[in-house]
Amino acid sequence: MARKPPSFEEALTELEQLVERMEQGNLPLEESLKLFERGIELTRTCQKSLQDAEQKVQILLEENSLPTLKPFRDEP
């Protein structure tokens, strides 16, 4: 059975823990690679959650005829 993706908060917490472990610098190469791979998965999960939240906010603003959001910084 497929594992349920973690919530944004769960993914971010796990990602922070992975970074902390890797920054200690005492992991074997193979374990570091596994943690790095997991970190990439968690980063993608967090990015997807943030994109979904941004879209929901945009839809709500449009539905309520509120001014649309402008990018905080130049986005490509």
UniProtKB/Swiss-Prot annotation:
Heterooligomer composed of large and small subunits. Belongs to the XseB family. This is Exodeoxyribonuclease 7 small subunit. GO terms for biological process: DNA catabolic process. GO terms for molecular function: exodeoxyribonuclease VII activity. Its EC number is 3.1.11.6. Keywords: Cytoplasm, Exonuclease, Hydrolase, Nuclease. It is an enzyme of class 3 (hydrolase). It is found in: Cytoplasm. InterPro entries: Exonuc_VII_S, Exonuc_VII_ssu_sf. Disulfide bonds: none annotated. GO terms for cellular component: cytosol; exodeoxyribonuclease VII complex. It catalyses: Exonucleolytic cleavage in either 5'- to 3'- or 3'- to 5'-direction to yield nucleoside 5'-phosphates. It comes from the Bacteria. Bidirectionally degrades single-stranded DNA into large acid-insoluble oligonucleotides, which are then degraded further into small acid-soluble oligonucleotides. The lineage of its organism: Bacteria, Pseudomonadati, Pseudomonadota, Gammaproteobacteria, Methylococcales.
